[in-house]
Amino acid sequence: MELQEAIALIKTDGLNTKDKQTWADLGCGQGLFTYALAGLLAKGSTIYAIDENSSALKKINSTGNVIIKTLHSDFINDDLDLVNLDGILMANSLHYVKDKPAFIKKVRSYLKPESTFLVVEYDTDKPVATWVPYPAGFQSLKKIFSEAGYSTIKKLHEHSSIFNSGNIYSAIITR
């Protein structure tokens, strides 16, 4: 996927693009969606790009408008020193989380009360051992976040995927 495709996948009117924001990209990899989010946020915003792959993090740099701070950490098991985030982006990383309800409860402590989740995932519930061990198709995602107290779980866009001839979807989630 190219940067412009990633931007189109997460672009939404539900995202505050006028005010400075602080976000975390959990499981950011080499930063494709970190850069996509940076392209949408207001100048002066900050994104914490978090991944356990230190080699991938070395490829991520700040953009002209948005500060990107990399953090080498296991976002699933480590307690992150993050507070008052405006949002969390999880692009192709939620499917590595086995206990999603417990994880959502944990990361909620990183967020402001009026915050946003942006999720990009494969629209399947069928696991693939190494790459998608704990999938969350959109209907499953709705159920998980609804049970965690979130009221708005909206599918934004879809993009074809080479994985299993299916689709990747994006969703915005708010309380």
PLM region descriptions:
Residues 101-113:
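A short glycine-rich, Lys/Arg-flanked "PGG" loop and its adjoining helix->strand segment in the class I
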Residues 134-149:
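Short alpha-helix
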Residues 1-21, 36:
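Conserved alpha-helix/loop element of class I SAM-dependent methyltransferases that forms part
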Residues 86-100:
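A short SAM/SAH-binding and catalytic strip from SAM-dependent methyltransferases
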Residues 76-88:
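A short acidic, Gly/Pro-enriched loop at the edge of an enzyme's catalytic core
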Residues 159-175:
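Core SAM-dependent methyltransferase catalytic element
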Residues 114-122:
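Conserved beta-strand signature within the Rossmann-like core of class I S-adenosyl-L-methionine
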